[in-house]
Amino acid sequence: MSRRGTAEEKTAKSDPIYRNRLVNMLVNRILKHGKKSLAYQIIYRAVKKIQQKTETNPLSVLRQAIRGVTPNIAVKARRVGGSTHQVPIEIGSTQGKALAIRWLLGASRKRPGRNMAFKLSSELVDAARGSGDAIRKKEETHRMAEANRAFAHFR
């Protein structure tokens, strides 16, 4: 028997201003080269822009955008008998949120625009309304999973 104790699960920290875990997840994904203060600046500017654009609570817009982009199912490449199949798998809530944040940031980086705060705010507002590249990515993933439903038993 092992003498080691069980490791405690780490809880996701929340950001200092909004005390929100989603904002913290977003900050950690937008982070480049360890510049966390710059990441916070970008997020807070984006939140201000969302407030100006929609005149509603920006955190509810963020939650709605992430809920809209979060996938329920994804495809995973699995090698069976020499050929690779795209096998649909269900995704948990944490992994789904992480994917949604990654897609939102990827879509906002691709957008034409002035700065990252502007692009991120535009993408979040679009995602909350049900349009934008991140939503398209989710729908594409769901289509792939639906098309490869025949391989679901390879899990």
From Swiss-Prot:
<dbReference type="InterPro" id="IPR036823">
    <property type="entry name" value="Ribosomal_uS7_dom_sf"/>
</dbReference>
<dbReference type="GO" id="GO:0006412">
    <property type="term" value="P:translation"/>
</dbReference>
<dbReference type="GO" id="GO:0003735">
    <property type="term" value="F:structural constituent of ribosome"/>
</dbReference>
<dbReference type="Pfam" id="PF00177">
    <property type="entry name" value="Ribosomal_S7"/>
</dbReference>
<dbReference type="InterPro" id="IPR005717">
    <property type="entry name" value="Ribosomal_uS7_bac/org-type"/>
</dbReference>
<keyword id="KW-0687">Ribonucleoprotein</keyword>
<dbReference type="InterPro" id="IPR020606">
    <property type="entry name" value="Ribosomal_uS7_CS"/>
</dbReference>
<dbReference type="InterPro" id="IPR023798">
    <property type="entry name" value="Ribosomal_uS7_dom"/>
</dbReference>
<keyword id="KW-0694">RNA-binding</keyword>
<dbReference type="GO" id="GO:0015935">
    <property type="term" value="C:small ribosomal subunit"/>
</dbReference>
<comment type="function">
    <text>One of the primary rRNA binding proteins, it binds directly to 16S rRNA where it nucleates assembly of the head domain of the 30S subunit.</text>
</comment>
<comment type="similarity">
    <text>Belongs to the universal ribosomal protein uS7 family.</text>
</comment>
<protein>
    <recommendedName>
        <fullName>Small ribosomal subunit protein uS7cz/uS7cy</fullName>
    </recommendedName>
</protein>
<keyword id="KW-0689">Ribosomal protein</keyword>
<keyword id="KW-0699">rRNA-binding</keyword>
<comment type="subunit">
    <text>Part of the 30S ribosomal subunit.</text>
</comment>
<dbReference type="InterPro" id="IPR000235">
    <property type="entry name" value="Ribosomal_uS7"/>
</dbReference>
<dbReference type="GO" id="GO:0019843">
    <property type="term" value="F:rRNA binding"/>
</dbReference>
<dbReference type="GO" id="GO:0009507">
    <property type="term" value="C:chloroplast"/>
</dbReference>
<keyword id="KW-0934">Plastid</keyword>
<keyword id="KW-0150">Chloroplast</keyword>
